[in-house]
């Protein structure tokens, strides 16, 4: 809600008002499953269409992919909705393989995503704190604020990175990063590490490409 077209103030449910220079509406999406319901397909607890690991629905002659499909989260193991272009694209290719008689599986989604906000890049992968709490999974968090490449090399810019991990096993559970440069590279590395089940100590031992314009010898 705003006082004019520039959205100069946000009005909360309790009536309090917060002045704002910019308001970003990020409401998410809701799966459109009316056609699936009319066809008698099973709908999952999240409201998405239930599919097996081959993306086949409860009707063996129908496959389903994309934003309206319920998937298993790769970290929590729980059913969830992750309406994202990357997984949807991969699901489409996997479903096509299965339709053509080449059995291929889609095991889980890890929610790896990225977007640009003006000059900043924000990215994330794995589970966030809310998801881990809902799943009853213990976690610890570490925040680091390194430069995107060697600080002595011209043009270095700060990045903020948050990593969630199991405090007992050290297994990486989720990560977020934001910065003008370098957030995409770090999240892709962490997404790979999370999907591989690596611990924070194993991640620290990864050998990554290094040169002063691209990173640090001790990369975050």
Short names for language-model regions:
Residues 10-12, 16-19, 106-110, 167-169:
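A short alpha-helix capping/helix-coil boundary motif
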Residues 42-46, 102-112, 138-142:
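A short alpha-helix-loop-beta-strand transition element characteristic
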Residues 27, 118-125, 134-220:
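Flexible, glycine-rich terminal cap/loop adjacent to redox cofactors
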Residues 3-11, 16-97, 189, 193, ...:
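FAD-site-proximal beta/loop scaffold in flavoenzymes
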